[in-house]
Amino acid sequence: MKRKTCISRTLAVTLAVFSSVAAMGQRENSSGNDWLKDVADRIQLHGYAQGGLNYTHCDAKDVNTFELKRTLFWANAQITDRVSFLFMHDFSSVVQEYYMDYRFSKNKALTVRLGQFKNGLSYENPLSPTSMEAIDVYSEGVTYLTGCGSDPLLGVQYGRDLGLAVFGETNDQKLRYEIDVMNGQGINRKDQNAEKDFIGRLEYRPVKGLNLVATGQIGRGHAVAASPYIPDITPGENYKRNRWTVGFDYKSAALNLHGEYLEGKDKNTTSRGAYLTGNVPLGKGVDLVGSYDYFNFNTDLDYDQHKAIFGVQWWFFKKNRFQLQYVYKNAALAGGFHHTACHAIMAQMQVRFDWAK
């Protein structure tokens, strides 16, 4: 009798222990699921790839090549209602952006950003290549003055830098401002001189569809290589590097158009230019695309370049498109800057995804 009672008690205790463990497991599993759900609710994933075929005829030489231009992936994490973080990597090159935002105001009036990000110089530079009409993406002036790649003194920096930004929107989002304090050396690099670069940006939307933009930069560059455009600046030299731009963007159902005037000062050399780019929707996702772009890399040496683009693009699914363009330029850099007729036919496929729970 006592033995049966002991066995019964043992079974009861064992069942109680297993029941308790099972309950704890369910709670832990439930807690884990809640944590995963919370993380998933706070993270957005994005990515895109651009690549295609280019044919170029320049200086009596024909070149044709398949080209993968960009393969980017980035993640946004909304840590709290005021704190967010972004990480971006280009699998065809390097890590391009990583920064944290803290919104001080209850609305969008004041946000501080710290990390590596696109500088606010020019209208075009902060924009994604997935929204630009040209396969070459930005205008010659923007590419040169913002450090996107055509300025040998700065190198290929993709229009990005390390630093601090303060920005916000007021007046029912009609007015937007931005102030950047940057190293001035580009991505993934320490500052190579004692000075910081200051960039200011002001946008005003007086009416629906129209945006007026003015930007400027004051700073000092540190030359990483010699430049055929400015031969009196030597590698390792610190030099004055100032810029300013004024531009506009207009969007409507019948026409999308943006343009800008740009000017830069590197040491004693002035560069300046202007561009006008737009597209006309033809229906069923097809747009007619055109652009005229003028830029003088060195006004003292008459290093002026004219560029024209004409083509079509087909948006076959949301932000996915196929582009076909003819490009004409009247100058080339091979063997030194010189004027010559250059023709190109470019075809590009763009695939993009955006995921948010």
Please name every model-derived segment.
Residues M1-Q50, D101:
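N-terminal periplasmic/intermembrane-space "pro-region" immediately following the signal or transit peptide
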Residues G32-N183, A194-I199, E203-L212, G216-I218, ...:
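Outer membrane beta-barrel
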Residues G52-C58, R82-S84, L121, M182-R189, ...:
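Sequence/structural signature of outer-membrane beta-barrel proteins
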Residues A60-V63, L86-V95, V156-G159, I187-A194, ...:
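Solvent-exposed loop/turn segments connecting transmembrane beta-strands
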Residues E97, D161-G163, D197-I199, R243-T245, ...:
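Short hydrophobic/aromatic beta-strand or adjacent loop that forms the aromatic wall/cage
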Residues L202, H339-K357:
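Outer-membrane beta-barrel "beta-signal"
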Residues E203-N298:
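Detector for outer-membrane/organellar transmembrane beta-barrel domains
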Residues N279-V280, G285-K319, Q323-V327:
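Outer membrane beta-barrel transmembrane domains
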